[in-house]
Amino acid sequence: MKLSQVPLKEIECAGPVMRASTPYILEYAEVASLAEDLFETYRSKINHAATKLGPRQRESNAESYALLGPDRELGHFHVVYDVDETRLAIELSDDEADKFYRLMRDQRIITPDLGLIRRVMSGNMAETVAAMLWQIGAIKVTLGDLRPLYKVDEGRNYSPIYIDVKGLASYPEVNDFVLSSAALLVRNLDFDVVCGIESGSIAIAAVMAQKLAKPMFYARRARRYPEASPFEGIKSHELFRKRVLLVDDTLVHGWTKTRVIREIREWGARVEACFVIFDRQQQGSTDLEQAGVKLDSLTNRDAALSPKIPREISFLTDEEYEEVVRYFADPGAWHAAHGYTFHEPSPLD
């Protein structure tokens, strides 16, 4: 059994101990192979000085393994077989326990809980939506030590944070709350038709259009052949002089959106408003403003990093929070500090 296969019901890290539990009663053979894989993960990703896994020590309904170095014990892996779950604990140094926590937190069983969010925080709508995105794992963070940094700006630059809301539909309660809130936000805008962008925002645009009782079409990312229409779901004469609300999942620089805006206008329609679920606040709104389009967003990076969102919702560590803040404050300096060349974002590069 691989460590990455274990679904976790709970996970926490306090000092030198990372604790987790799975709702499954693991078999002895599964735990034995799990311990082997845990040790290999520890040696390859966290402490190259580790030499071997100690023998299993069993007592009553628990067992443990020592993680051994050349001349001493480096830590321990404990397993407790409970009535309806298997509890796991890893004892290491504070720093190493934190790394194991960051490795394993994405394996938690995601159970969206809007009630919990409302109980533990008192934020505005943007902060509440951001908390829900954290809760379902739509916002991801890496320091680059255990998992690679994310590539952005068409693969030319790096980022410690990635926002992916394409999985909203996997969580119906969250999806309904977020898109109902989105429809409420744009209901007073003047538009006749909703336009999504292939492929990330097609589902978002379709649900919003349904809630707003408006027709919907979508723009292609690229034409498959020169004569192909840039749009699907609408004909040229149907778009003539229509007011279009452009909808997308996230906004970084706005290059794709300004291209779509230009193509819509070439078909004789008007575009004066754009809506996104998440705005990374990296000058994308300025790009849209220069194109004569006003941006509305449901949430953004400021809301996602709000101190009102507790760590039991975001699962973010202090080190990760500080890393993301440094990145957004000055991406160029952040790249230099990590030994990377920063390429000034430009759609013409």
Where in the sequence are the language-model features?
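PRPP-associated nucleotide enzymes
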Residues: M1-V247, L251-D349
